[in-house]
Amino acid sequence: MGKFVVLDHPLIQHKLTIIRRKDTGSNEFRRIVGEIGGLMTYEITRDLPLEDVEIETPMGKTVQKEIAGKKLTIVPILRAGMGMLNGVLEMVPSAKIAVIGMYRDEETLKPHEYFFKAPKDIAERECLVVDPMLATGGSANDAIAALKKRGVKDIKLAVLVAAPEGIKAVQEENPDVDIYAASEDDKLLDNGYIFPGLGDAGDRLFGTK
């Protein structure tokens, strides 16, 4: 079973409180979502493999460490996942980007994939799927399925807030995927939103409500 980890660093928790507030505007919401994404990336990438590399400093040659193998691929789920992307890239600027477009049917709450674009060698890369909210788990599971269909074997999921129902759904369908969250929230409401949650993260990020 993949692990579920709440990243309870004080800075993450402080910033999460700010974006939970209903009166936080889009500009501040967008900035802080990116900041939390970066802070979470620092913790999530602790186990990236390193290799020795010979370099030359102003003082002479030396052997130092750098990330081994293919670079990490960040996979934001459109559209809300884009809010976390820049923060992650600030921590791992060499990362590649794959984009998955998903939309949720307002009546059935089921997700549908409408777009997928990724590096050609994505099957050889570790992928970090990012989306601010893990609600029913449908979008996350569909995104993970889209990656696995293309041969990806090493997948992690990073979200800001997670409902117990979404955590369970991902762990049952994808027991090989580790989930990282800034918070495990109380529950999923009948309308498909997380409580206490963030509201509609996509609308708040892009000012479309």
UniProtKB/Swiss-Prot annotation:
Q: What does this protein do?
A: Catalyzes the conversion of uracil and 5-phospho-alpha-D-ribose 1-diphosphate (PRPP) to UMP and diphosphate.
Keyword Protease included in the entry's annotation:
no
**Source superkingdom:** Bacteria
Give one GO term, molecular function aspect: uracil phosphoribosyltransferase activity
Cofactor(s) the protein requires to work: Mg(2+)
Q: Does the keyword Secreted apply?
A: no
InterPro entries from the entry? PRibTrfase_dom, PRTase-like, Upp_B, UPRTase/APRTase, Ura_phspho_trans
- Where is uracil bound in this sequence? 194, 199-201
Write down what this protein is called.
Answer: Uracil phosphoribosyltransferase
Record pathway: Pyrimidine metabolism; UMP biosynthesis via salvage pathway; UMP from uracil: step 1/1
Which SUPFAM superfamilies has this protein been placed in?
A: PRTase-like
Q: How is its activity regulated?
A: Allosterically activated by GTP.
Reactions catalysed according to its record: UMP + diphosphate = 5-phospho-alpha-D-ribose 1-diphosphate + uracil
- Biological process GO terms, please? UMP salvage; uracil salvage
Gene3D superfamilies, A to Z: 3.40.50.2020
Tell me which family the UniProt entry assigns to this protein. Answer: Belongs to the UPRTase family.
